[in-house]
Amino acid sequence: FLDHILLLFNFEKKYFDKENINNTFVGHPLLEKNAKSKTDLSNLIPKDKKIISLFAGSRSSETSVLLPILLDFIKLMNDKFNDYLFVFHATEENKNYINDNIKLANLDNIQVISDENVKSQILSNSVFAVSKSGTVSLEICNAKIPSIVIYKMNFLNFIFVKSLVKIKYANIINIINNKEVIPELIQNECN
């Protein structure tokens, strides 16, 4: 059925070699991406603020569930600290939704960015990241930024997915390592 398979991760090679399936390691595009041009961030980021990057998801179903949780997180952090700038890494599709909810929450130490080059630079200058489970966790890990992974979905969907998928972790980094390297707050723990 397979003539040849292209591998995203080097560790996959031993599995396909064992099964005598022709393969070539090509790498993961997110892990090899380098910003070609740098943007001056001095107008975007106050010098006296530490950046916490936030990833609420790219799909509206994810964003609508995770955004209120992330806004509550910001409020809790603001009660204890005043030296953080929270930056939402948005898509063009969810940028307005995030901005509208920030206005309703009456928070002023938040920025929303959607430019890919700027997002990469912001992430590399962050002291911490909170992200949804998914490919973005690879990007965060590659940037060597401490993080946690959050994910929450409709209860019935969660039960359905949990019955189909028999893995211990939600984050690809933890799945690869078969242990919790990146802390996960999933479903009921994500509040």
Regions found by a protein language model. Give the residues of each.
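Nucleotide-activated sugar donor-binding and catalytic core shared by glycosyltransferases
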Residues: 1-191
